[in-house]
């Protein structure tokens, strides 16, 4: 069996979503790669109160209703969106920064984060 060279860099290849005390949602390099977030400058947020899940839908245009600018760190190895109003509106308490393994829902075309 031939060997395959591993050339990826970054802290983790596993996609992670952080929900931070300051009202931001962050994405690590693994999430940006796996979900191709670097091709989407905006996201739209959704919330399912019954299942306590956040939906994060990447979009290409600012005109999409409810869109938020996705900010990228140096080299696009991290990304974040400021969304304190989202947490306040849905009364989602964020007392500590927490990391989650989001799942991409192909049907809905969005990342689902189960709180």
Which residue ranges define each predicted feature?
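Long, contiguous, secondary-structure-rich segments that constitute the structural scaffold
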Residues: 1-24, 29-115
């Amino acid at each position: 069996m031939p060997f395959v060279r591993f050339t990826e860099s970054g802290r983790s290849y596993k996609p992670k979503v952080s929900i931070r005390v300051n009202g931001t949602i962050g994405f690590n390099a693994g999430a940006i790669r796996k979900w191709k977030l670097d091709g989407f400058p905006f996201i739209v947020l959704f919330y399912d109160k019954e299942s306590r899940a956040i939906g994060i839908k990447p979009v290409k245009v600012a005109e999409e209703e409810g869109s938020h600018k996705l900010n990228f760190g140096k080299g696009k190895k991290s990304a974040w969106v400021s969304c304190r109003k989202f947490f306040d509106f849905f009364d989602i308490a964020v007392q500590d920064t927490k990391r989650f393994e989001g799942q991409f829902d192909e049907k809905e075309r969005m990342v689902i984060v189960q709180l």
